Design a protein with these regions (language model features):
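Conserved glycine-rich cofactor-binding loop
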Residues: 23-24
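Catalytic loop of short-chain dehydrogenase/reductase
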Residues: 144-169, 174
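Active-site loop of short-chain dehydrogenase/reductase
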Residues: 15, 92-93, 137-151
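Conserved glycine-rich Rossmann-like NAD(P)H-binding loop of the short-chain dehydrogenase/reductase
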Residues: 39-53
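Substrate-binding pocket helix/loop in short-chain dehydrogenase/reductase
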Residues: 107-108, 115-120
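The beta1-alpha1 cofactor-binding region of Rossmann-like NAD(H)/NADP(H)-dependent oxidoreductases
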Residues: 49, 70-82, 113
Length: 174
């Protein structure tokens, strides 16, 4: 659900939020935008520990409760760890933002099984798994799942083959 902010922009009413890939770039920008008093955010990161810690310091200054969790989204045990951690801190969830993604260039002629599997695991399987677990830990009816995709889903090219296929799958999941 949404309400109007003082500047006339719509803001989410979610207070207990999980954001994957939130330590840098778009994920960090999303966390900053949603932060504020009475907001709790679980920030997932994989390799960007320093950035995650820096973001936590910034968000804490505006009274956001921030919890950091490291995890490799291509590993099912790490996905379970992220959900267990988030549940222990938040108790229940209002919003899941599947932002993290793997973005490596390949094409039909040079893709490898390893790259294919990594892209599908991080960009499609992890969001599907987290969505399933999110649904088990909600309260009420006003909950949000936001899956971040990009223009490559609609403007197909032969480049970033594995990425594009995984994000097209995520679009279908959405």
């Amino acid at each position: 659900t949404r309400h109007k902010s003082t500047k006339g922009q719509e803001k989410m009413e979610a207070h207990k939020i999980i954001i994957t890939g939130a330590a840098t770039r778009m994920g960090a920008a999303i966390a900053k935008k949603l932060s504020g008093p009475d907001i709790e955010i679980v920030i997932h990161y994989n390799k960007s520990k320093a950035s995650a810690e820096n973001l936590k310091k910034k968000l804490t200054k505006n009274k956001t409760k921030v919890y950091l969790v490291k995890g490799d989204l291509s590993k099912e045990n790490d996905l379970k760890k992220i959900i267990t951690f988030a549940k222990s801190k938040l108790k229940y969830f209002d919003c899941l933002i599947n932002n993290a993604s793997l973005f490596e260039n390949d094409n039909l002629k040079n893709f490898t099984s390893k790259s294919w599997n990594q892209h599908l695991d991080v960009n499609l399987k992890a969001p599907a798994y987290l969505t399933k677990e999110f649904a088990k830990n909600i309260r009420g009816k006003n909950n949000n799942i936001i899956n971040i995709i990009d223009q490559r889903v609609f403007k197909l090219t032969p480049f970033f083959f594995s990425y594009t296929l995984s994000k097209t799958g995520l679009y279908t999941l959405t």
